[in-house]
Amino acid sequence: MDVIPAIDLLDGRCVRLYQGDYQQSQVYNDNPVEVARQWADQGATYLHLVDLDGAKQGKPVNLASIEAIIRGISIPVQVGGGLRDRASIVQLFNLGVDRAIVGTVAVENPTLVKELCAEFPRKIAVGIDARNGKVATRGWLETSEVIATELAQEMAQLGAAAIIYTDIHRDGTLSGPNREALRELASNIEIPVIASGGISSLTDLLGLLSLEPLGVTGVIVGKALYTGDVDLSEALRAIGPGRWQDVPPDIDSSLFG
């Protein structure tokens, strides 16, 4: 399973939010390139970048930081936040972004998603951010009546490369991932699902391994890396390619100290 470090960009700095609340942001580093290099040096093979200003404004904002990160590391990155038209996505691909993540537009303009998936095969992922099973949009500032599982099925049919599923109530809380929601989602679609939100420990990561056969192929880790609750190199050894071994999902955390 892929372990993907998250770098959230706000005003060009690396921050973390609590449950997506812009008023509860904590700056971890003024230099996101430094952070990206740190994760790459520890063995990351992919990075997840979120343009928080972009998510709010509906267009990419932190382009300079994104470009600097891409130039500063040799591993691919995916980017989400405010990608609501073709021009914004092309702009990112021209910078060297490997994969673009659309969210709001999946709810508001699925036809555009279909066109993008056809034009950029395997390059468009759909971020589904849910509150109580319903999809939130516009930087998590609004909640729609769209059911997350139904949207995932529609996006899979339109050609999305993957679904990145975030449980907003758990994001930035270190309260553990929503395994039941992930199980339901992955069971209903044929494309990969990447889990996001709430990871707090190595035990949480090991607990996701039972979902891998269903199609949960990766996990995005944010706050736990920055607080030190999860050590990236240890996480990669535990659940990444060439991991120690397949571990039962409800392993006693005491085994790992």
Swiss-Prot record:
Pathway: Amino-acid biosynthesis; L-histidine biosynthesis; L-histidine from 5-phospho-alpha-D-ribose 1-diphosphate: step 4/9. Its EC number is 5.3.1.16. Disulfide bonds: none annotated. Transmembrane segments: none annotated. GO terms for cellular component: cytoplasm. This is 1-(5-phosphoribosyl)-5-[(5-phosphoribosylamino)methylideneamino] imidazole-4-carboxamide isomerase. It comes from the Bacteria. Keywords: Amino-acid biosynthesis, Cytoplasm, Histidine biosynthesis, Isomerase.
